[in-house]
Every structure is written in C-alpha cells, then in structure tokens.
Swiss-Prot record:
InterPro entries the UniProt entry points to: PSII_PsbZ (IPR002644), PSII_PsbZ_sf (IPR036512)
Principal subcellular localization: plastid
Family label: Belongs to the PsbZ family.
Keywords: Chloroplast, Membrane, Photosynthesis, Photosystem II, Plastid, Reaction center, Thylakoid, Transmembrane, Transmembrane helix
Subunit structure: PSII is composed of 1 copy each of membrane proteins PsbA, PsbB, PsbC, PsbD, PsbE, PsbF, PsbH, PsbI, PsbJ, PsbK, PsbL, PsbM, PsbT, PsbY, PsbZ, Psb30/Ycf12, at least 3 peripheral proteins of the oxygen-evolving complex and a large number of cofactors. It forms dimeric complexes.
Membrane topology: Multi-pass membrane protein
Protein name in the entry: Photosystem II reaction center protein Z
Gene label: psbZ
Organism: Oryza sativa subsp. indica
Length: 62
C-alpha cells in the first residue's frame, strides 16, 4: 500500500510540474488555447483525480 501511495504522490508531482510549464505556454501562444483546450482540461482532470487518490490512500495508510 505504501508503494501505491508513493507512486501516486510522484505522479501528482510530475503532473503538477507539467501543468505549471504547459498551461502558461498554451495561454501565451496566439492560437494555443483553441487548439489545446482539451489537453489542458484533460491534464487538470488528471490532477484533480490524483489529488483525491492521494487523499484516499493517505487515509488508508495513516
């Protein structure tokens, strides 16, 4: 169970880092938002899901 928690936290950190870099780039590009809207929403949905997964796994471990 601890390995699953550690992998979920690692995935959350990686996803957060990717979103911190990619979202400003999407907004800065002239046509980026209309072309990459689905990618940003998918990344945000993944991030929210990982936050809930980490919270659930944390409550099971503690």
């Amino acid at each position: 169970m601890t390995i699953a928690f550690q992998l979920a936290v690692f995935a959350l950190i990686v996803t957060s880092s990717v979103l911190v870099i990619s979202v400003p780039l999407v907004f800065a590009s002239p046509d980026g938002w209309s072309n990459n809207k689905n990618v940003v929403f998918s990344g945000t949905s993944l991030w929210i899901g990982l936050v809930f997964l980490v919270a659930i796994l944390n409550s099971l471990i503690s």
